[in-house]
Each structure stands twice: as C-alpha cells, then as structure tokens.
Amino acid sequence: MRYLAIDYGDKHTGLAICDPAETIASPLTVIEGQKDLIKKIADIAKNENVEAIVIGLPLNMDDSQGFQAKLVFQFADRLKAHLQIPIHFQDERLSTFAAEEKLAAPEFTRKKKKKKRLDAIAAAEILEAFLEQKNAP
C-alpha cells in the first residue's frame, strides 16, 4: 500500500511517501503556507496513487493532546472532504529532533537547504514509525 505522510504546520507542511512494498519512506516536498494546502495535498495524493494518509499527531510527553493536536484534527477533517481514502494518525513526538539529527550530515551544510528539507524529513520519520508499528510481528 502506498502511504503519504504529512507533518502539518502553520507555515510549512512536510510530505513524505513510501514505496508500494512499504519498506522505504522518502521525503517528498515541503508546501509553504496555507493557501491551497488541501488542494495541493489532494493533487499529490492522486498523482502519486496514494492509498492512505498518515498525519503526524503532536502529543505532549504525557500522551495528552494539546492545542496543536486539535489543529491537526481540524486539518484532517478538511482533508477528508477532498480525499476518499483512509487517514491514520501517528505520534510525531521527537520526529523533528530525529530529522534535525539527519540534517547534521555533511551533505546538508547550507542552513537554508536544511530548513527547506526539515519538514519533509520529519514527515518521513513519521511514516517510518507508522510502517514499523504496522508491520511489526
């Protein structure tokens, strides 16, 4: 199954996608701002033959849902109106930290390049966690 992961944010929304065998999660793109965000994601999902969506859910360290989690659920409701495919949620705690660790690699030396890719890499981290959980024995 082909999944599209979303690291939702007010200013930047990162997207990642997996291969049909569900073995590799790859950063796809970062969408800037909110203008036409839902339409852009719906178009990407259709063009990439996505069968389900995974949205990062920002939980607090005590597992409670804060204000940002409510915004993610509202975003998911808007997305459901445009896509007739399942939407899953995945705990995204520490996904940005893991993405920042990956960006410390030498190939990401320019600060602007790092910032541009961070949200897409965080989305890939979210998708990797989802796939590991889903495919665990």
Regions found by a protein language model. Give the residues of each.
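Phosphate- and other anionic-substrate recognition elements at nucleic-acid/protein interfaces
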Residues: R2-Y3, D10-K11, A16-P137
